[in-house]
């Protein structure tokens, strides 16, 4: 992963890493303690990469978490992404090696400037940022995965790359 990776390739690779990073995480849902059921997190792509359709890039089940892949250079786009989901919390996956803390600080400073002292607006945007994930976290999480998970990442990259490039998908089975 690099900052100069083509946008579609970065989205495919980041999806594959995140899908495999989260897939073994368990959560519990139920209407009472006695009805709790264990479920594993699942990440889904919501459409084609770089479709410019205004959609969210990935959605996590069963928690309903939204992920948007973007670049660090245009904070107006982040605010538009937040607006399009009505300020629902969103995780930004950013093609940068800048630390996520620095990106978050810059984004929050940009929000503060744009809010012109209006606390309600500032808080709505600040509260809509669930998490910042950069190339640094993606690399770190890849290094923590098992060999089987790395193989799964490579298979996912191959499948989604072929899909994006309108190539035939080869089935290894």
Predicted regions located by residue number:
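Interdomain/boundary linker segments immediately adjacent to catalytic/signaling cores
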Residues: 1-26
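Catalytic core segments in nucleotide and nucleic-acid processing enzymes
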Residues: 22-173
